[in-house]
Amino acid sequence: MWKNIRVACLLLVLLIVVINAYRDQNQDWNQPINILLHPINADGLPTTEKYIQQLQQNDFAEVKQYLEKNSQQYRGQSSYFMIQMGRELDQTPPKMSEQPSILNNILWSLKFRYYAWKQHESIDGSPSLTLYLNYYDPKNTKELKHSTALERGRIGSVNLFAAHKQERQNNVVLVHELLHGFGATDKYNLANGEPLFPIGYAQYDKRPLYPQTEAEIMGGRIPLSEDKSKMPNDLEQTVISLLTAKEIGWVQ
C-alpha cells in the first residue's frame, strides 16, 4: 500500500515537471531573477548550526554582482538578480545513488522534485530557482561530495563548508550549480574532474597554454598543466565563457 502511495506521489511530481518543462527552458532574462537559498545543517553539528544562524543575505552579494556583471557583458544590459535568504530546513535533499545508472538518475530526479515540492511553503513565493545549501563543518568533513542541480525543476543541492574563510570559494560552487539550473552544462571530465579542452578553459588560446590563471565557471578548476588543476579561490578567478552564455540564453 505504502509503495503504491509513493509511486502515485512520484507520478504526480512527474506530471508537474512535464507541465513546467516549457517554462523552465525559456527563462526571460528581462524579468527579475529571484534566487531562493535554503540553508541546511547537513551534518547536524552545533558548530554548523552556529554558522548558519550568522548567515546574512549580504554574504551572497558577490554572487549577485558577478551574475549582473556577466549578464551585462553578454546581453548588453544587466539582468536583475535578487538573492533571497529562505528558511532553514531540517531535511537534506535526497542524495544521488553511489551506483549511477539511467534508472537511478531518473528515480533520484523524481525524488528531488518531490522533496522540493514538499519543502515549499507559500512564504517562499515563486522563485526563479531554488538552491538547497547543505553546510558541513570543515573540521569534521574534509571533502564534500558532488553538488547537483536540475534545469527542469530549477532546483539544486549545493554542498558547502560552514566556515567564513570558505565563503568566497563556496560562492564559486554556488554559481556553478546556479548556472546548471538555467541550462549550463559541465565542462570537465566526469571521471577525474579535470577541465575539458578547449570548452572548459577560460584562456583556451593562451600561449603557452599552461599554467592558466582563471577557471571557466562550468569547467570548475584552473588548469595548471595537462593533468593538474586547482580550485579557484573566488569568483574573481573565474569567467563565464561564450558557450556557457549561449547555453543559458544570454547569447542567441
Where are these regions (language model features)?
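Stable alpha-helical elements in mature extracytoplasmic
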Residues: D59, V63, N170-L174, M231
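Extracytoplasmic/periplasmic, Sec-exported soluble proteins
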Residues: T47-D59, L150, A162-N171, Y210
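Acidic/His-rich structured neighborhood in mature extracellular/periplasmic domains
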Residues: E88-V172, N189, G193
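A mature extracytoplasmic/lumenal domain signature
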Residues: P39-N41, Y135-D137, A162, D186, ...
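Active-site recognition of the HExxH zinc-binding catalytic motif
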Residues: Q169-K187
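Short, solvent-exposed loop/turn elements at domain surfaces
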Residues: G44-K50, N140-T141, S225-S229
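Propeptide-to-catalytic entry region of secreted or membrane-anchored zinc metalloproteases
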Residues: W2-L10, L15-D124, Y135
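Metalloprotease/metallohydrolase-associated module, dominated by Zn2+-dependent proteases
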Residues: M1-I5, L10-V17, S147-E151, G156, ...
